[in-house]
Amino acid sequence: MENLNWSELGFGYIKTDYNIRCYYRNGKWGELEVCSSEILNIHMASTCLHYGQESFEGLKAFRGKDGKIRVFRMDENAKRMQSSSRGIKMAELPVEMFEEAVRKVVKLNERFVPPYESGAALYIRPLMLGLGQQVGVKPAPEYMFVVFVTPVGPYFKGGFQPSKVCIMREYDRAAPNGTGTIKVGGNYAASLVAGEIAHEKGYAAVLYLDPKEKKYLDECGPANFFGIRGNSYITPQSHSILPSITNKSLQQLAEDMGLTVERRPIPFEEIATFDEAAECGTAAVIAPISQIDDLDENKSYVIAKNGKPGPVCESLYNKLRAIQYGDEPDNYGWVTIIE
């Protein structure tokens, strides 16, 4: 792509050539369709527009030094989308169909996969919408599955550099037994006000506390949180956190590095004991945290005392990216090569 400066890409939408679509009607999924239009034609009474019957996923494709294109853990995204469907009574898309759609959309748009080590990747966005004209609150009779792609740079402007986050108890991203564990748009809509306030104050994200008691660490903006203390990788266990595929992968890599992995409720007072902390997810990969400001208690916790990423975060980041780009062996079968 001669007109794209790969190293200067932000995390935004750039038009590509094709997307994939599939419809669920009369109790079954149809065939995958290739489309070049960016526009979806849906009825104004569709449940996705009124009652939030919508779910989505996010994954990436990487071009390796060998020129091959690799997609990271798409089977996990397929299974998580099924979980989201169960959570809001949508039709479940078979894992095989999800994977076929991803393979096809990446292959059709392979000229948009950024070159090796440009710092950019091809972001893949699967999306499911409830269709069918209804005014009452009930599950949709029909569904549309869409996958589009766009080349992206780092999610955070600083890239792999520590940034500040804040705690604000006034806001929650999900209810205690609500939809926090699934990937639906409502969770992100609920985070917009707090997120904008945080950005206006100069923070990269909000570190939420649990919505029930406000005692434990929860999600960190649109990503999972983890802390490093000594030889331990510590990440929250909660009924309102999305199970991050990146976090799951990092836990395995941490164990491979000899760290003890702890998944448990983390009292927010433990922040003061962390040697390192970060948020992690498909979009951010790993975004180290330099400082956590508790705006309600007027306290600051400095994590990165020298202003640089910690050694464990840096090792995990380099290891994960090396697997994604094919620079290190894929010992766990996480990568799919697009032929």
Q: Which stretches of residues belong to each language-model region?
A:
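Extended, Lys/Arg-enriched charged tracts that mediate electrostatic binding to polyanionic substrates
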Residues: 115-129
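Charged, gly/pro-rich active-site loop segments
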Residues: 105-119
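Helix-start/capping segments and mature chain N-termini
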Residues: 1-105, 127, 134-339
